[in-house]
């Protein structure tokens, strides 16, 4: 067998129907569009147009707003951190920061920081520097003998810099 001899089985592929190419083709003249009217013309179907009826996107009320100051935080559970420690991706002695979480592959990118959540079990004694932490996460870390310091992440600090002011 050679690459230039490979072909589909007979009848496996069907040629595309070219419309509007003469009456004898079976799809000539109106090309399967019927006769006249808006749908027979080009540039048909105005998106969202419902024939004069009030369209759905205008019948439904506007709702909510986009908060310009909302923080886009990575949510990390204690269980994931314990798995990383067990796998040797996180150093027990070092402080767990946004940068170390990215390096360990727990989060993909820094975004606006990290919120520590208390789902899962933590047995390793770790110290954390995170943007936010839930009460249950702080309790679980302290129960394991570690500590949590909430660091307000500002622009450069989440993007690899080292400017972090403790709150």
Curated annotation (Swiss-Prot):
A biological process (GO) annotation for this entry? translation
GO terms of molecular function = rRNA binding; structural constituent of ribosome
Alphabetized UniProt keyword annotations: Ribonucleoprotein, Ribosomal protein, RNA-binding, rRNA-binding
Gene Ontology CC entries for this record: cytosolic large ribosomal subunit
| Residue stretches of biased makeup (Gly residues) | 21-35
Please note every region of biased composition (Polar residues). 1-10
Extract the Pfam families matched here. Ribosomal_L27A
InterPro entries listed in its UniProt record: Ribosomal_uL15, Ribosomal_uL15/eL18, Ribosomal_uL15/eL18_sf, Ribosomal_uL15_bac-type, Ribosomal_uL15_CS
Which parts of the sequence are annotated with region: Disordered?
1-37
Q: What does this protein do?
A: Binds to the 23S rRNA.
Q: Family, per the entry?
A: Belongs to the universal ribosomal protein uL15 family.
Q: How does it assemble?
A: Part of the 50S ribosomal subunit.
Q: What is this protein called?
A: Large ribosomal subunit protein uL15
């Amino acid at each position: 067998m050679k690459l230039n001899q490979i072909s589909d089985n007979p009848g496996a592929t069907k040629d595309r129907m070219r419309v509007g190419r003469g009456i004898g083709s079976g799809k000539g003249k109106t090309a399967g569009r019927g006769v006249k009217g808006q749908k027979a013309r080009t540039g048909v179907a105005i998106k969202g147009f419902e024939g004069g009826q009030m369209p759905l996107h205008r019948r439904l009320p506007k709702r909510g707003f986009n908060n310009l100051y909302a923080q886009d935080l990575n949510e990390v559970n204690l269980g994931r951190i314990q798995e990383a420690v067990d796998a040797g991706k996180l150093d027990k002695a070092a402080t767990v920061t946004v940068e170390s979480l990215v390096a360990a592959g727990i989060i993909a990118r820094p975004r606006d920081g990290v919120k520590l959540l208390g789902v899962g079990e933590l047995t390793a004694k770790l110290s954390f520097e995170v943007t936010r932490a839930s009460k249950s996460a702080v309790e679980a870390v302290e129960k394991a003998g570690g500590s949590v310091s909430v660091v307000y992440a500002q622009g450069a600090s989440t993007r690899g810099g080292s400017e972090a002011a403790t709150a």
